[in-house]
From Swiss-Prot:
Keyword flag Cell membrane: yes
Superkingdom as given in the UniProt entry: Eukaryota
Subcellular location: Cell membrane
Task performed by this protein: Regulator of red blood cells formation.
Protein's name according to its UniProt entry: Small integral membrane protein 1
Lineage, uppermost ranks: Eukaryota, Metazoa, Chordata, Craniata, Vertebrata
Length: 72
């Protein structure tokens, strides 16, 4: 069975000497993933975006409720 380009090499006399080599494109993708989806700035951005969405939903509900329950 072939894996997706990763190769495992081991020394048959020592099971502690195992190395895993990833293809270069995979390590680039991991670097991009780590830069885009992790980190303090990204977490703060996600929190700010979710708070903004909640405020917009609250305002939309308030306006909708105002016009639905308006006596007149």
């Amino acid at each position: 069975m072939e894996s997706n380009g990763a190769s495992v090499q081991y020394n048959r006399w020592s099971e502690d000497n195992i190395t895993l080599q990833e293809p270069q494109s995979r390590s680039r993708l991991l670097g991009i993933y780590n830069r885009v989806f992790t980190g303090r700035l990204v977490i703060m951005f996600k929190i700010a975006a979710s708070l903004t969405v909640m405020v917009v939903m609250y305002i939309a509900g308030y306006i909708t409720g105002f016009y639905v329950h308006q006596c007149g």
